[in-house]
Swiss-Prot record:
Organism of origin: Burkholderia pseudomallei (strain K96243)
Subunit architecture: Homodimer.
Entry binding sites for a divalent metal cation: 103, 113, 152, 182
Function according to Swiss-Prot or TrEMBL: Involved in the heme biosynthesis. Catalyzes the aerobic oxidative decarboxylation of propionate groups of rings A and B of coproporphyrinogen-III to yield the vinyl groups in protoporphyrinogen-IX.
Sequence segments annotated as region (Important for dimerization): 247-282
The reaction(s) this protein catalyses: coproporphyrinogen III + O2 + 2 H(+) = protoporphyrinogen IX + 2 CO2 + 2 H2O
Protein name: Oxygen-dependent coproporphyrinogen-III oxidase
Gene3D superfamilies per UniProt: Coproporphyrinogen III oxidase, aerobic
Feature type site, description Important for dimerization: 182
Pfam families: Coprogen_oxidas
Cell compartments where the protein resides: Cytoplasm
Length: 307
């Protein structure tokens, strides 16, 4: 994080290309192209810059799919970005990244989240400080070991060229991060998560970021290809809404990206792109023992060595 030699133009070009590749692939899979919403911040707003949101709602397969690119700058890092680095509080910053969340309609197809980003903190008279962050995680409604192993093995393969220790380190980080403390339960089966990362220097750290971004489609599309035609009914949709409620709770209470966006004066529509189209809550409800719904909690929403 102290190496100030970096090339933000290369990072920007990669991220814009990644968004386009993923959006095209998702549109082809769904049968409906993702719409494009290009935006820029206006004069006098807290942030400068802009981005592009690719969005699909009520598609053939995806009930909601959003993938956003943003490149914004501000005069002071928000508290969520400088909490672990108080020495950077108050610095100017540039933040650029791609973030996506996909909510399939079929409850047997998992929700997925992926994010890759770069932040640069600046202060007049001092060298800029940069770091990378990101990862991907899977949130099944109904658990399948085959799917969990495929997802985690793809994540592990993406990180292996950069050090055998990275996957177990980033997996634990993900398990710890995507956890609803007030519920004492995991959001999903995890994946990988990293932040404040530049320890390999700019070139290798950027290569690692690209490897993670490039691994998204092969990590996810084979899973939903297997499950997309699985029959379901009202019971499964009701449980899906219940689990989506947990997703909403995490994103609004704990997620650093959501908090960063809201605290920095970000674009609300883009920040809340991760929200499911429907969600539900039931008072003190618990699935019956021995059901697939109970099995999700006992066998999948616990840290496991999936890879």
């Amino acid at each position: 994080m102290t190496d100030s030699t970096y090339d933000v133009n290369r990072v920007r070009a990669y991220l814009q290309g990644l968004q386009m590749r993923i959006a095209d692939a998702l549109g082809a899979f769904d049968g409906t192209p993702l719409a494009a919403d290009t935006w820029r911040r206006g004069p006098g707003e807290r942030l400068r810059g802009g981005g592009c949101t690719r969005i699909l709602e009520a598609g053939g397969f995806f009930e909601r799919a959003g993938i956003g690119f943003s490149d914004v700058a501000g005069d002071a890092l928000p508290p969520s970005a400088s909490a672990s680095r108080p020495q950077l509080a108050g610095r100017g910053f540039e933040a650029l990244g791609v973030s996506l969340v996909l909510h399939p309609r079929n409850p047997y197809c998992p929700t997925v989240h992926m994010n890759v980003r770069m932040l640069i903190a600046t202060k007049p008279g001092e060298a800029p400080v940069f770091w990378f962050g990101g990862g991907m995680d899977l949130t099944p409604i109904y658990g399948f070991e085959e799917d969990a192993r495929h997802f985690h093995r793809t994540c592990r393969a993406a990180l292996e060229p950069f050090g055998a220790e990275l996957y177990p380190r980033f997996k634990k980080w993900c398990d710890d991060y995507f956890f609803l403390k007030h519920r004492n339960e995991a959001r999903g089966i995890g994946g990988i998560f990293f932040d404040d990362f530049s320890e390999l220097g700019f070139e290798r750290s950027f290569e690692m970021l690209q490897s993670v971004g490039d691994a998204f489609l092969p990590s996810y599309l084979p899973i939903v290809e297997r499950r997309r035609d699985t029959p379901y009914g009202e019971r499964e949709r009701a449980f899906q809404a219940y689990r989506r409620g947990r997703y909403v709770e995490f994103n609004l209470v704990f997620d650093r990206g959501t908090l960063f966006g809201l605290q920095s004066g970000g674009r609300t529509e883009s920040i809340l792109l991760s929200m499911p189209p429907t969600a539900g809550w039931r008072y003190d409800w618990h699935p019956d023992p021995g059901t697939p719904e109970a099995r999700l909690q006992s066998e999948f929403l616990v840290p496991r060595d999936w890879a």
